[in-house]
Amino acid sequence: MEDKKYKIADLQEKSEEWKIPFSNLLAGFVLEEFMLRFSASEFKNRFLLRNGTVLGLEQYRKKNILKLDFFCEPDERIPEKLLQLYLQKKEQSPVRWKGTISSQQAGTCLELQGQFEEMKVPVTVGIHFMHLGKIWGLVESCLLY
């Protein structure tokens, strides 16, 4: 979203205009704010989003899926650094973050809460460790044919 101070009233107006339930649009807004900060970070080239279809107006009209799943090169330090990125207050960001980290079988899980004004949205970020070269090879071979 463009560089603007957003208010709840702005989302309510867009909710009516786009015919999206307000709670769904709020959740989508928080997810997209997560991705906006992520895309401007040092991590943007070290992760591959597995479930990008959870983003976008059509998905918000149907149902919100508040889990983002990423593949990431194996590095146990990255999830903690990523969590710290979100816990830092950014003046230009309308969303404030709180969160915790936990280890999973093949990766890590961040349990975040994005707060926009007084409203809170839970967001789960799954980080699955995998050598991305294998995945990029599959993606490239699919694009060639």
What name fits each language-model region?
Residues M1-Y145:
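Compositionally biased terminal segments of proteins
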